[in-house]
Design a protein with these regions (language model features):
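Accessory helical-bundle/CTD segments and flexible terminal tails appended to RecA-like ATPase motors
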Residues: 1-196
Length: 196
């Protein structure tokens, strides 16, 4: 569309068409590597985590920050965004800190191939997660009532009883980030366990 016509105006139509043709040919012949995208990781926790309008005023900038946070691959990327927010907008409000913590959790989960971190009912669901039998027993000992389904590589970890984490409450009301801390510890424990 309009973005392409800007490129065409810069280089001229004939040169632009030749460049596009060469790029398509390079891609088809394998000269350009087809990038493997890291699997998406869905994190669903009942917690208030967002960038408020009164903190980051521009909608376009907020959307860009959300995209960047969703794409982070390692904790250092989250730290870089945290420093940028501090520099541009000052001290982070609670919900912005929670959003950065969710991004760090997502990066940790992605780095171990986990695509789902979901609090549902009375369980935290992690999938896919491969646990050898010794680690399954450890899971049951550390988190009584938990279930591991080997065929689907799904761990259902019993959530601690805490009224602030009630999934029936709207997420906007939940400001307690201890669930997020607990989930991060669980993912860290189980991924360390699955790599030994």
């Amino acid at each position: 569309g309009g973005e392409q016509s800007g490129h065409i105006a810069d280089v001229g139509f004939d040169l632009y068409m030749r460049m596009v043709g060469e790029a398509v040919n390079d891609y088809k012949t394998g000269i350009i590597d087809k990038e493997e995208e890291a699997p998406e990781c869905k994190v669903e926790l009942p917690i208030n985590a967002h960038l408020a309008e009164n903190y980051v005023p521009g909608e376009r900038l907020r959307l860009d920050l959300y995209r960047r946070l969703a794409d982070v691959a390692k904790p250092a990327d989250v730290q870089s965004i945290r420093e940028e927010l501090l520099d541009r907008f000052g001290e982070l409000p609670e919900e912005a800190n929670a959003l950065l913590a969710v991004a760090q959790l997502r990066a940790l989960a992605k780095s171990h191939g986990i695509r789902e971190v979901v609090a549902t009912g009375k369980f935290l669901r992690l999938a896919p997660l491969t646990l050898p039998e010794s680690r399954q027993l450890r899971l049951m000992r550390l988190y009584p009532g938990s279930i591991y389904k080997a065929p689907t590589r799904t761990a259902l970890i019993t959530l601690p009883k805490n009224p602030a984490w009630n999934p029936s409450k709207p997420a906007a009301e939940i400001v307690d980030t201890s669930l997020l801390t607990w989930v991060t510890e669980v993912v860290d424990q189980l991924t360390k366990a699955s790599t030994t």
